[in-house]
């Protein structure tokens, strides 16, 4: 859809919202969440939903967090919200190297009354985001809609906007767009057109587009600051990253400010400096062979090596993630396998039918995989007697319900275009992650029923020498060498979520400072892995990388085209790092309901 079509869609969207509430019941008040959900109903593309979601909706809702219907576009705050939506279009549909259309204004933008070939979105910033008070009245006047005016519902094929010419209800696209998109309309989203690079546009890594700070017109990104604080904590500030033409970005272009780095009078480090600085500190730990205690399965005999269980018998979450990202669906065989694992987890199969031999005892010990946060281990979920321990591990029935829901939501979004279900998918998927690996930012582990992939080039400490030549699989946890670059470069080799889990429970990450830095590593590793399809030693393993819409909308066609895809990572990581209370509450509710 071209810029003209998108501008018309914005206008049509607000008109439909206004129209649907022109006869509100007495004292009808809708919360900003309800209106926001309705707004998303009218938006076709996932990246648009993500972009609008990053806009300043809280500002629109005012202090009481509520607004009255119909839309009061005479209200300056609501006009600002409209402008924020247009701002998203400006940032995502910017053109460079074209002749500006000097006399454009907000009214012409909304009406689509301009020549798109001559139009430069950059010019609009001085109008829709005015710094000059003289432009304020003009901007508001252009955006006002008579809210008291009641019009009959338009016919199906057209919508009339306050004396203006009718707008077709179908998407208004150029001929070239229609040719490209005609074969893809059946999907929830479409592959976005590559856009020209514009060095004046800066895309915030966590979602909201902003003007380059060097420019004269800057839209305050309050939501970006809020998300940054929620994800990383108040001590970390994620700066802006220049938008490339296509593909991935270099991590060295970002600057991170960590509050604790003020101790040496240095406020800003680029990513390499941050890594080097932490490497120096972690090397000190590694050279002294400092180990990290992890709840482990104690062998009955110290001479018995605890073998890693067979990979085929364990739940391969990484494969599941990749399948969902690439095709947006889960196959019946996978569901059956997951159900089998849950059944095994729920019953008595962890220690069963093993011969009384060294090998049998090793297998039996290795499969005692249910471990609570306190390090206690049980043969299976049903073997847990204490109520306090029971609540630390979700009932397998909940896991099975999540799996069923996940499949249902995936199918409905992909096949039936139920766009609002995308949020539910993200929630269900993140809940599943929390069930499997616990809260990632609490340094606690609820259950450990996965296997580390067999990787030959695992960085280890010097104490690993005693394990060389053995058949015990990967070295013990405390012998794996931890450095930031290890995290960055080994992400593709190792189970993604297992890496996050290990970092979260690593005692060397126990301080707020280290935890914040760890989250930076995770964010950058995700970005590097997904945005760079030719990441060394990983392309052959994982194949082409889909966009982050694979996490939040489970699309089947979207491929990364530019940094705007990072917008989809923000809510995902936000949920990942705030799962603790949600999962714990679900566990407590489930335990209470089952009479435990």
Swiss-Prot record:
Keyword Zinc: no
Keywords on record: Capsid protein, Hydrolase, Protease, Virion
GO terms classed as biological process: proteolysis
GO molecular function, one term: peptidase activity
GO cellular component, one term: viral capsid
Presence of the UniProt keyword Hydrolase in the record: yes
Disulfide bonds: none
Main function: 120 subunits of the putative clamp protein VP8b appear to stabilize the capsid shell.
Protein name (record): Structural protein precursor VP8
Biological source species: Rice ragged stunt virus (isolate Thailand)
């Amino acid at each position: 859809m071209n810029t003209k079509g998108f501008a018309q869609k914005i206008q049509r969207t607000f008109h439909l919202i206004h129209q649907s509430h022109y006869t509100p019941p007495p004292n009808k008040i809708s919360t900003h969440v309800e209106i926001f959900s309705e707004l998303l109903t009218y938006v076709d593309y996932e990246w648009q939903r993500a972009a609008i979601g990053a806009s300043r909706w809280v500002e629109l809702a005012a202090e009481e967090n509520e607004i009255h219907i119909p839309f009061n576009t005479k209200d300056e705050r609501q006009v600002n919200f409209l402008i924020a939506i247009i701002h998203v279009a400006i940032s995502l549909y910017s053109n460079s190297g074209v002749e500006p259309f000097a006399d454009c204004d907000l009214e012409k933008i909304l009406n689509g009354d301009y020549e798109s070939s001559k139009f430069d979105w950059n010019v609009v910033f001085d109008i829709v985001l005015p710094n000059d008070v003289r432009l304020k009245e003009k901007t508001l006047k252009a955006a006002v809609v008579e809210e008291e005016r009641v019009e009959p519902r338009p016919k199906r094929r057209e919508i009339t906007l306050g004396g203006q010419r009718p707008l077709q209800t179908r998407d208004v696209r150029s001929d070239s767009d229609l040719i490209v998109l005609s074969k893809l309309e059946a999907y929830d989203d479409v592959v976005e057109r590559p856009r020209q690079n514009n060095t004046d546009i800066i895309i915030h890594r966590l979602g909201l587009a902003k003007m380059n700070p060097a420019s004269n017109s800057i839209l305050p990104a309050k939501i970006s600051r809020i998300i940054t604080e929620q994800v990383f904590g108040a001590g970390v500030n994620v700066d802006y990253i220049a938008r490339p033409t296509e593909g991935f970005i270099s991590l060295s272009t970002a600057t991170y400010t960590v509050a604790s780095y003020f101790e040496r009078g240095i406020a800003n480090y680029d990513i390499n400096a941050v890594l080097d600085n932490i490497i120096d500190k972690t090397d000190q730990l590694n050279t002294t062979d400092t180990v990290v205690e992890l709840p482990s399965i104690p062998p009955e005999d110290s001479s018995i090596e605890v073998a890693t269980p067979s990979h085929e018998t364990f739940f391969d979450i990484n494969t599941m993630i990749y399948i969902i990202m690439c095709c947006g669906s889960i196959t019946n065989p996978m569901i059956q396998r997951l159900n089998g694992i849950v059944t095994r987890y729920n019953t008595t199969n962890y220690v069963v039918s093993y011969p009384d031999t060294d090998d049998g005892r090793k297998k039996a010990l290795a499969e005692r995989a249910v471990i609570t946060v306190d390090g206690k281990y049980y043969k299976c979920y049903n073997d847990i007697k204490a109520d306090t321990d029971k609540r630390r591990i979700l009932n397998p029935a909940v896991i099975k319900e999540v799996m069923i829901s996940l499949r249902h939501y995936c199918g409905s979004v992909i096949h039936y275009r139920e766009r609002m279900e995308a949020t539910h998918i993200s929630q269900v998927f993140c809940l599943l992650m929390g069930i499997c690996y616990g809260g990632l930012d609490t340094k606690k582990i609820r259950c450990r029923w996965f296997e580390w992939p067999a990787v030959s080039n695992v960085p280890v400490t010097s104490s690993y020498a005693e394990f060389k030549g053995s058949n015990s699989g990967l070295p013990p946890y405390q012998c794996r060498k931890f450095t930031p670059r290890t995290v960055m470069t080994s992400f593709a080799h190792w189970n993604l979520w297992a890496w996050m889990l290990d970092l979260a429970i690593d005692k060397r990450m126990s301080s707020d400072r280290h935890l914040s830095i760890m989250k930076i590593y995770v964010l950058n590793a995700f970005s590097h892995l997904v945005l760079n399809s030719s990441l060394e030693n990983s392309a052959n393993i994982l194949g082409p990388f889909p966009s982050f819409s694979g996490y939040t909308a489970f699309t089947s066609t979207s491929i990364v085209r530019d940094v705007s895809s990072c917008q989809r990572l923000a809510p995902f990581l936000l949920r990942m790092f705030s799962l603790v209370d949600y999962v714990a509450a679900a566990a407590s509710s489930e335990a209470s309901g089952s009479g435990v």
